[in-house]
């Protein structure tokens, strides 16, 4: 029972101390309030009577002066805050509300596509698309075309893209060619509504198009992809045409060289009346050798008859005639080797004929090589034909961006106002603590 009594007594003393402390604080606040009212009235009287003042030696007067100074600082801080709200916070709030009211809500349509060839289709990946074969440049070329002024002009000419955003139902800050020079640059406005992002890791390009409605955003995105596909097909066809045309011209040139070499060969054959002068000369030498053999045999037989005293033999006249005929034929064949037939003789034109035949063979080999290269070039051109492949069709979603480019300056003023507000609060708190 003694312990419980001690606890009870301790609680009563604690409650009594708390009550006395509370009463003391209330009394102190009441005294300070009464003192402030007294000092305010005294301060008002001091404006009419400048000689009135407090005694510096009085401790209560010093305390009252300190409270008055602190009260004045509090009033100045409150006045600064009111001015801050009136001249900065309130205008910024009005501007922000106007920005929300004067900007339109847009829908954003996203589509994913790639640019590839038949050769890279089988083993397509992000690395093969952008890493090998300089495929990255092809993707960036399509991106630059979509974001070019040429595409902007075509979209405006065929679809009225910029005119669509200049309608009165679009808010002032989001409208194209709005009053006061807002959104007056057509190309910059076009880039604010059309963008293309390149994902190097995935090897894809993502198209983003904004419009007032989801259906219109998807329509514009689909048309941009169609124009980009036409551009890729046109560039690819032009590259193939130029390559094949060059190869065909090379084949044509080789064929013309072959025809010229064969024509020169036919001319020399026509002049010499020989298909192959070398074979003709060989045949002449064989004829001369055969005639000389027969002539030697006839002369030997004739001499044998004469040695035996058979000069009256009936074979003698026939052998004599044979010898004369053989000698005449040998002479004619030798004249064929030495005399000129037309502009060249057979022996003299042999080197010229060999040169022409060699040139003809070289021209034929070059023509066959050019023809084979043309066939390979056509196959390679088919494999390297570029085309635009759409991975995902345009799908529209609500765009969370509500501000046009003309309202970006608002963020700067908001940050500036917040900085000024925080600085003013810190200064006020410091003055109040002093």
Curated annotation (Swiss-Prot):
Coiled coil: none annotated. The chain crosses the membrane at residues 84-104, 409-429. The keyword Cell wall biogenesis/degradation does not apply. Residues 1-58 are annotated as: Disordered. It comes from the Bacteria. GO terms for cellular component: Gram-negative-bacterium-type cell wall; plasma membrane. It is found in: Cell inner membrane. It is a multi-pass membrane protein. Its main location: membrane. Residues 1-50 have a biased composition (Basic and acidic residues). One of its GO terms (molecular function) is carbohydrate:proton symporter activity. One of its GO terms (biological process) is polysaccharide transport. Signal peptide: none annotated. Keywords: Capsule biogenesis/degradation, Cell inner membrane, Cell membrane, Membrane, Polysaccharide transport, Sugar transport, Transmembrane, Transmembrane helix, Transport. Belongs to the BexC/CtrB/KpsE family. NCBIfam families: BexC_CtrB_KpsE (TIGR01010), PRK15178.1 (NF011725). May form an ATP-driven capsule polysaccharide export apparatus, in association with the VexA, VexB and VexC proteins. This is Vi polysaccharide export inner-membrane protein VexD. It comes from Salmonella typhi. The lineage of its organism: Bacteria, Pseudomonadati, Pseudomonadota, Gammaproteobacteria, Enterobacterales.
């Amino acid at each position: 029972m003694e312990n419980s009594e001690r606890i009870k007594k301790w609680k009563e003393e604690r409650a009594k101390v708390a009550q006395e402390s509370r009463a003391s604080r209330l009394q102190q606040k009441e005294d300070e309030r009464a003192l402030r009212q007294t000092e305010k009235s005294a301060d008002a009287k001091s404006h009419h009577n400048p000689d009135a003042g407090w005694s510096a030696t009085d401790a209560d007067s010093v305390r009252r002066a300190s409270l008055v100074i602190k009260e004045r600082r509090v009033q100045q801080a409150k006045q600064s805050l009111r001015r801050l709200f009136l001249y900065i916070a309130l205008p910024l709030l009005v501007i922000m509300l106007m920005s929300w009211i004067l900007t339109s809500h847009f829908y954003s349509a996203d589509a994913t596509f790639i640019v590839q060839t038949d050769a890279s289709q089988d083993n397509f990946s992000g690395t093969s698309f952008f890493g090998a074969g300089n495929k990255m440049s092809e993707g960036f070329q399509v991106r630059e075309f979509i974001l070019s002024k040429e595409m902007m002009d075509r979209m405006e000419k065929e679809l009225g893209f910029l005119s669509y955003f200049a309608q009165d139902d679009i808010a002032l800050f989001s409208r194209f060619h709005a009053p006061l020079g807002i959104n007056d640059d057509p190309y910059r406005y076009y880039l604010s509504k059309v963008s293309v992002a390149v994902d190097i890791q995935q090897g894809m390009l993502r198209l983003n198009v904004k419009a007032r409605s989801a259906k219109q955003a998807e329509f514009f995105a689909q048309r941009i992809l169609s124009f980009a596909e036409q551009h890729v097909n046109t560039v690819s066809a032009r590259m193939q045409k130029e390559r094949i045309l060059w190869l065909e011209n090379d084949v044509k040139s080789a064929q013309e060289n072959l025809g010229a070499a064969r024509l020169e060969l036919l001319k020399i054959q026509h002049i010499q009346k020989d298909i192959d002068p070398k074979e003709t000369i060989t045949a002449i030498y064989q004829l001369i050798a055969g005639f000389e053999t027969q002539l030697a045999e006839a002369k030997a037989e004739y001499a044998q008859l004469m040695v035996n005293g058979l000069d009256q033999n009936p074979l003698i006249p026939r052998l004599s005639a044979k010898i004369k005929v053989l000698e005449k034929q040998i002479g004619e064949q030798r004249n064929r080797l030495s005399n000129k037939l037309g502009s060249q003789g057979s022996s003299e034109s042999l080197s010229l004929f060999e040169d022409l035949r060699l040139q003809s063979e070289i021209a034929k080999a070059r023509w066959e090589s050019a023809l084979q290269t043309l066939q390979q070039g056509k196959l390679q051109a088919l494999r390297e034909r570029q085309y635009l492949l759409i991975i995902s069709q345009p799908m529209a979603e609500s765009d969370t961006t509500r501000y046009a480019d003309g309202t970006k300056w608002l963020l700067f003023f908001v940050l500036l106002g917040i900085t000024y507000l925080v600085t003013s609060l810190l200064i006020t708190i410091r003055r109040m603590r002093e």
